[in-house]
Amino acid sequence: MGQRRQTKSQHAKPRTFRTSPVMFEKEIFFDSDEIIDAVGQSKFVLKNLHHYTVHPNLAQYYEPLKPTALQKFLARNRKIQSFTLKVIEYDQDKTLLILTNNPLPCPIDHQGKDVTPKYFSNELLLKESHQHKPTENFFLPLMPQKKNLRSGLKPVFPLMLLEDTKSKREQWFRFSTDNDFKSEGKYSKVYTLRQQKKMYPQLTFASVCKKYMKNDVSKKSGSDSPTSQMIWEPLTLSSLLEKKPTRTAPGESEFRNGRAQQWFIKSATVIK
């Protein structure tokens, strides 16, 4: 047994005691741009970011992405479309004002309603109908129509011919001039109220007319008979919305699929 132990001890490798190397830390000073140690100066490298304990300000090492050509084209196209929509909306309001003050000589107005022609008098229309009589008339002769008085007719407008400026004629209609488009300046107020209603759809205006109407009713006695009643007409958008209930039309774009923004309802019923 003693010999075996001796042979094992002879063949065994001598044990060496491993000692971990002692690392001396360098004295490091941190700056926002560079990292400086006591031995030498070392610049910050982005690849060695995980080796640093304190990270410097990295905002200066990153550049913002530049917009591509497609993004520039889309932004420019978006600006042009928004400007075009504003111009179209302004033109529509201006056209509505002009057509309201100066309706066209057409049996259908700009809102699609049937109206009587406003540019031609009844007397002129009767003359045109009598001129185109058929040769053979199988019907009874027409009753003689009474001529209206001069006060009931429309005003007569002078007519100047280009061929002969001295000869003067009369006509029952006239074309619009620049003076017809001059208004009292209430268009900007109505336009502002309309823009307010679009920006703030939940905004409600205080009704002043109802307060005055209540005071007038309290002052009146019961014996007074309502012989003459004034027809109240709304002058602003707020009073019109209070007078008639409205309903928002479908559509999300600026044109709302070519439909009206609001529908006026004559009789509103609540369904539960």
Curated annotation (Swiss-Prot):
Family matches, as InterPro entries: TSGA13
Pfam families the record matches: TSGA13
Top-level taxon of origin: Eukaryota
Protein name in the entry: Testis-specific gene 13 protein
Lineage, opening ranks: Eukaryota, Metazoa, Chordata, Craniata, Vertebrata
Underlying gene: TSGA13
